[in-house]
Amino acid sequence: MVTGATMGVAPAGLGARDTLRFEASLCLYGHELDDETTPLEAGLSWVVKLGKPDFVGRAALAGEKARGSRKQLLGFELEGRNIARQGYAVMRGESMVGKVTSGTWSPTLKKSLCMAYVDADSVDAELAIQVRTNPVQARRTPLPFYPSRARG
């Protein structure tokens, strides 16, 4: 730390790392990724090369691409300083149509954001996030939240 002190280097913990991961919309196993979620649902189609020789799961992914995914990972901005946490419900009226995977206050963008999986037939609907017992309006926002790979 002494060597980097003149350049502003300071210790950072897991919270800082997770916030940076979240703002860049990078998937984390146990949140956006699990053994029930496909790469196409997670927005990772760029890593799936269906034109390459056969690989485990190729037929299933080709079928999913042809018919469409059952759910989609979306980004949301919440009203006010409400914070959506993992597991909070995404609501379409009175119906639960998805679940929050990650959410926090973004110190870089100065707003409350979350990522959530939403059923394919509800991705274009008006949605709310159930924060504790209150539905909070959620506006779709493109992923990644902070698109640049470098800070300047």
Q: Language-model segments: which ranges?
A:
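Conserved, structured C-terminal
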Residues: 1-152
